[in-house]
Amino acid sequence: DSVVTVGSGAFVFSTVRRVTVGNNVVLIDMYAFQGCDKLRYVNIPDSVKRISYYAFYGCTSLKSLYLGKGVETISDYAFYQCSQLNYINLPKSLKTIGDFAFKDCYKLLYVYYEGSEADYEALGITGTNHVISDAKKFYNYNYEG
């Protein structure tokens, strides 16, 4: 539990299928899980504040994503080409979703947001994240990981 960062490229092209990040981790760094094409499920704890650029780029089998209630930033291209992603939850703590954070996530159907519709609109999600905009939203959603 002394690990506070999943380092840049830590699991790049690994065959890992499921990831539960440790409870002391605050940062998932660039390319941490790039190309983990067998990865299907990710559980990110409340301690994580930032998911960096390209952190899960090319995780083409990723179906579901649980983001802990402390996540504040999802950086540009963080989940780029996660082409099997069906649903995500977004915590109310979220302040920034970077450009193209969910680019090519064409199967994203559902977004569960912890806050209100007004809180969600205040995020200012841009057209570069149209797959989120196009997905069905559920507001005031209380989830447990």
Residue ranges and their predicted role:
Residues 103, 124-128:
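A structural signal for leucine-rich repeat
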